[in-house]
Amino acid sequence: MTEAWRYSAQGISVALRVTPRGGRDDIDGLETLANGRTVVKVRVRAIAEGGEANRAVTELLAKALGVPKRAVRVLSGTTSRLKQVAVDGDPNELGEALRKLTAPKPD
């Protein structure tokens, strides 16, 4: 499985599949879509209305990656479950943090 993020000089760009009204705010690992694209599965309690789910996603990622909220922004997919999100910061540290967050969880 390939990584669901790309590195840049400013940080990383992460492909997400978001489940609004998912019961809890959490990162559920990686998923390969039917087209072969790898995404990070994210669920949030917020509803997908008025940008609430997008705000919840950016807050969740900021907290999980240890960056300020202003360092996370939705690049594309604001009205879609599939989103591209930019995270500003050290790309190597962010990539390592995402690897740990998306690693398979023991049963």
UniProtKB/Swiss-Prot annotation:
Pfam families, per database record: DUF167
Q: Which Gene3D superfamilies match?
A: YggU-like
Spell out the HAMAP family in the cross-references: UPF0235
Q: Which family does it belong to?
A: Belongs to the UPF0235 family.
Q: What is this protein called?
A: UPF0235 protein RPC_0058
UniProt organism field:
Rhodopseudomonas palustris (strain BisB18)
